[in-house]
Amino acid sequence: MTESEIPKEYNANEVEEKWMEKWNLSMYHFNWGEDPRPQYIIDTPPPYPTGNFHIGNALNWCYIDYIARYKRMRGYNVMFPQGWDCHGLPTEVKVEEIHGITKNQVPRAEFRKMCRELTAGNIEKMRKTMLRLGFSVDWSNEFVTMEPSYFVKTQKSFVRMYNDGHIYHEDHPVNWCPRCETAIAFAEVEYESRQTKLNFVHFDKVDIATTRPELMAACVAVAVNPKDERYSQHIGKEITVPIFGQKVTLIADEAVEPEFGTGAVMICTFGDKQDVRWWVKYGLPLVKALDKQGRMTKAAGKYEGMTLAECREAVIADLKAAGFLYDQKSLEQNVGLCWRCDTPIEILSEPQWFVKINHEGILKAADEIKWYPEYMKVRLQNWTGTMEWDWCISRQRIFATPIPIWYCKKCGEVMIAEESWLPIDPNENTPKKACACGSTEFEPETDVLDTWMDSSITALHVSGWESEHEMRLPTQIRPQGHDIIRTWAFYTILRSLALEGKRPWDSIVINGMVLGPDGHKMSKSLGNVISPEEVTTQYSADAFRQWGAVGGSTGSDVMFRWKDVVSASRFLQKMWSIYRFSMSHLKDFEPADAENFPPDALLTIDRWLLSKLNKLVDTATKELDGYQFDSTFKAIRGFAWEVLADNYLELVKGRLYGEDPEGRKAAQYVLYTTTRTLSLLLAPFIPFFAEEMYSRFSEESVHTQTWPAVNEKLISEEAEAAGEMIKEITGEVRRYKSDLGMALNAPLKKIEIYNAEIDTGDIAGATNSEVELMAGAPSFEYVPVEVKPNMGFLGPRFRKEAGAVVKALQAEDPAAIEAQAASGKITITVNGEAVKLEPEAVEIRKEVISGGREVDVLDVKGAVVVIVR
């Protein structure tokens, strides 16, 4: 092999910049045409384009890239697409901040243009970070949800689902964020425990307890448990609501908890989901006391225009003044918050668009999908089981996919766009036909679609749905975080079933969250945020990718620790030193030499290493098939450092530098095979380093090569056992030299090995000594040569006399003292008096004599090693 100069130190940034410039990214492209390879389509998460590709994104994309690179090497036609989920409130807020406007101060089209421009710039920033981290994205299959080429599919999916009866329009209670002024789905509600007050209020016949006195204007009934005898005489009677004066009926319902508060509750429209259930069940009237901005309406009387907080304070004051409020108690309450702004959500009844939830179909599809880890499926099952309301998909914003709907001004009928009209914005275009009533005057739908309506068709989009390509659903895998199982995973399954009647993917692999170095969730307020750019600048992309691989098992949260990155960087240098040493001995070795190398020319330690190497390939393949990145990379790193560097290279140096051409050729073959195989195994994890390694084996990219196959013929327990013995013997001899203060390359007179059938050449080379295999069992004579007093025993007993006892012991014949110790009692004379000692008072040092020579014997399992001095 030819060898260019290999520097001693590995310059990661220089290498990574070189390959970023050299790589032809078309090698990552998916082939839509006829291809003998099985397809492997990844339903990649489209991140929100904030301009910051944060460390949580980076961890997820590391996982995806490990999968994509591995599957390509396994012979799959891989698609690793990249999408961008553009629409959403944060962009609207940022545009308002940048331009010093509100969205209602400019035309809708102009505001959307501002949002698009900001988003496009943010995408470019994030794309640069992704390229720097070495992700093998198929950029020929990039998609941007704000582009007409994508949102036309979102609109088509809406039209088809509406026509098929999956979507409907209704005035129905929905979760509402007063701050964002939009409806939100239940999946977008997050819960937090907060302290509130439980207020005890006199009604004219019963006392009620409520946490929402500000909604008394919307009280439409009072409920008690039918088994609660305290109120049985009042059930069905009218009750007057204090301050507001409306009369409501006392109803009995088993959902009321008699133990809570007074056992009587106020039903308002709407304080919570239970109010909605009762409202529907009993056909109660609807009183809208709260508007979309979170202020009280005319229904609240003198409290009109107040915020909820202001109204609560005023109502409580008035109840106290009138003598209706007779007690208050602190209560810890689970409060639903908007996932975007943390504002407590309200429930308003507004005309909205909904998607019907197919509970049974979603659960069945979830069972057909393979989950990694398996226990994550329970999260989807639990969420599906708790879904009482359909998915509210309409939002009161501007920067989102328009709902392709108009309303006839004359008869009020819905006019839905035909597919041939799409993409379309009903606020800028009118229908291309008249209403069934004959009218041509329409009001456009001003609401837009929930952004999950865009991202929930990613599996359909990347599989070729509604394109010139053949449909390839289901895709093979969905990689995503556990925090969006109830949204992205849930909605994608729902939509794939509704539109195509198929599951969206064969498998789903779940990643955890990234925690800061302090173990807490990363946040600017805690000052524990680390960016991928910080790591790549200080260390390298490959070091960052190693952290991603070994940080934790699939599904678990991963803590970012700088020491893990430092360890990763050290491994790169260690692996580089291994590679550099190996290549220095392969200058006269050609790949053809490896193809024709006879296996019987291998020595024991060669077969030992190749057996372990093939076991490593087998382990790595099985673990990566199960998406176990941490155990895979740890196994590769452990083999390279501990098996190859610490043992094999030390054992074969004698052959590599020696005069035996056949032994040297065998070692060269093993070095070539092992380093080349390691470059392939490392390729999915540290692509820059692996490419640099492989570039001296071939002009082709390592990322276009085939994953190494297991050679079962080279796996041998017998070879490994013999190799372990060679390793252990060599290690014991090295420790022996170290204990005596000898240099490790200092020669010994001779090493004799009994009870072993192994090659001795590598032991001789590693110990710089003559080594001989001996037949039969060795005979040893153990001659006592010194009495060593045990001062831990003698000192406390004899104190000042201990020195005299030691002197007397050392004057005795070691053999005689040994004989006395064996009998259980030692008697010596100290200053003319007999002194008796226990056997533990002394240690007898013995010399080992074998064949008339003084030797040392080393304890090695399965063999006896004799060192001739």
Swiss-Prot record:
Listed under catalytic activity are:
tRNA(Val) + L-valine + ATP = L-valyl-tRNA(Val) + AMP + diphosphate
The cross-references to PROSITE patterns, in alphabetical order and at most eight, read: AA_TRNA_LIGASE_I
Q: Name one GO molecular function term.
A: ATP binding
EC numbers listed for it are: 6.1.1.9
Name a biological process GO annotation.
valyl-tRNA aminoacylation
Stored Pfam families: Anticodon_1, DUF5915, tRNA-synt_1
**CDD domains with a match to the protein in the record:** Anticodon_Ia_Val, ValRS_core
Please report, in chain numbering, the residue ranges of the motif 'HIGH' region: 47-57
The protein's location, in the record's own words, is: Cytoplasm
GO cellular component terms?
A: cytosol
Key word Nucleotide-binding present in the record?
yes
- Motif 'KMSKS' region, chain ranges: 521-525
Which keywords accompany this UniProt record? Aminoacyl-tRNA synthetase, ATP-binding, Cytoplasm, Ligase, Nucleotide-binding, Protein biosynthesis
Q: What class of enzyme is it?
A: ligase
Name the HAMAP family for this protein: Val_tRNA_synth_type2
Any idea what job this protein has? Answer: Catalyzes the attachment of valine to tRNA(Val). As ValRS can inadvertently accommodate and process structurally similar amino acids such as threonine, to avoid such errors, it has a 'posttransfer' editing activity that hydrolyzes mischarged Thr-tRNA(Val) in a tRNA-dependent manner.
The domain-related comment in the record is: ValRS has two distinct active sites: one for aminoacylation and one for editing. The misactivated threonine is translocated from the active site to the editing site.
| UniProt-recorded name of the protein | Valine--tRNA ligase
This chain's source organism reads Methanosarcina acetivorans (strain ATCC 35395 / DSM 2834 / JCM 12185 / C2A)
